[in-house]
Design a protein with these regions (language model features):
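Catalytic subdomain that performs nucleotidyl-dependent activation
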Residues: 18, 56, 63-135, 139-142
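The feature marks non-catalytic terminal segments
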Residues: 116-175
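ATP-dependent adenylation/nucleotidyltransferase module used to activate substrates
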Residues: 1-71, 75, 105-113
Length: 175
């Protein structure tokens, strides 16, 4: 909040009971990430309605998008990632991700150049290297080291889909 104040930006901090809810709902061995994300999104939707916001901008960058693609592919059996623009299921909210085409390393360099702090994740699970997202993040780092540009290639693939070459019959064109 200090950075926002110093720059004259409005900042709203909302304290929630998400941690308590998660402790009551999840088993000890459960990964909290998807439930936490849904609960936080619910808070954002509610706040957007309260202040009359027409869009909710999230800070997901290209690495987040690619990691989500691989997590869904490997562990959920879905071919989906994070769109740059998403309308909520009820049509009342529009989520935008203006940094979705920016790699994490580029976002960090820009923030540093602008004198903006890099705020680390405050989630206790975030540093757990055994979590699937952390493992996928390491996999991508290794791939990028061995094959520079592979992350950009994966990001490009998300904009260049050939539905007829996938197994989903809903994407097949009838002759």
């Amino acid at each position: 909040t200090r950075t926002c104040r110093e720059r004259g930006w409005e900042c709203i901090v909302r304290h929630t009971t998400i941690n308590e809810t998660m402790e009551n709902v999840l088993d000890v061995d459960d990964t909290p990430c998807s439930l936490c994300g849904r609960l936080r999104r619910g808070v954002l939707y509610k706040m957007a309605g309260e202040i009359g916001a027409t869009k909710i901008a999230l800070g997901h960058h290209a690495d987040d998008c690619i990691e989500t693609l691989l997590l869904n592919l490997f562990f959920e059996g879905n071919l989906k990632a994070m769109p740059a623009k998403l309308t909520s299921d009820n049509g009342q909210h529009v989520v935008i991700r203006p940094l979705v085409y920016v790699l994490e390393v580029e976002a960090r360099a820009y923030a540093k150049e602008c004198g903006l702090p890099i705020v680390p994740c405050s989630c206790p699970a975030c540093g757990d290297l055994s979590l699937q997202r952390q493992r996928v993040k390491r996999l991508l780092l290794d791939l990028e080291r061995e094959h520079p540009g592979v992350k950009n290639s994966m990001l490009s693939a998300l904009k260049n889909v050939t539905g007829s070459h996938l197994l989903d019959v809903r994407l097949q064109r009838e002759p």
